[in-house]
Swiss-Prot record:
The gene is rplM. This is Large ribosomal subunit protein uL13. It comes from the Bacteria. InterPro entries: Ribosomal_uL13 (IPR005822), Ribosomal_uL13_bac-type (IPR005823), Ribosomal_uL13_sf (IPR036899). Part of the 50S ribosomal subunit. GO terms for biological process: negative regulation of translation; translation. One of its GO terms (cellular component) is cytosolic large ribosomal subunit. The keyword Ribosomal protein applies.
Amino acid sequence: MATFSQKPAEVVKKWVLIDAEGLVLGRLATIVANRLRGKHKATFTPHVDDGDNVVIINADKVVLTGKKYTDKVYYWHTGHPGGIKERTARQILEGRFPERVVEKAIERMIPRGPLGRRQMKNLRVYAGPNHQQEAQQPEVLDVAALNRKNKGNA
């Protein structure tokens, strides 16, 4: 029996809605990254984008365990000499774009390259409870019910 390899034309993508309120950031990101890659499917093929489309709402209400809320630092470089910048998770979550914490956590769990960039385009993250994908009728995934540790204490 030959190994099954899915073709891009055979891929069936579902829409999944996840409410991130009260969920632990790393656990949420792991579940979403696996969904985006398609690793939850029996038809997973490493070189084909066969993951689902994921919509995350309430990304600003995600929970970081321990002292990560104040101590976790995000670094980036402007490209200019001496251009290293940093922000704490607290500054980002209380800033203009709190959904970036969730986006970066997921992005850094997806392999880098053309396929990873294509898979990241299947992710939509919203800071509030409203989203623009009602027309796709996303199926709700209760991440908190998958494992009791997925729900944060804060």
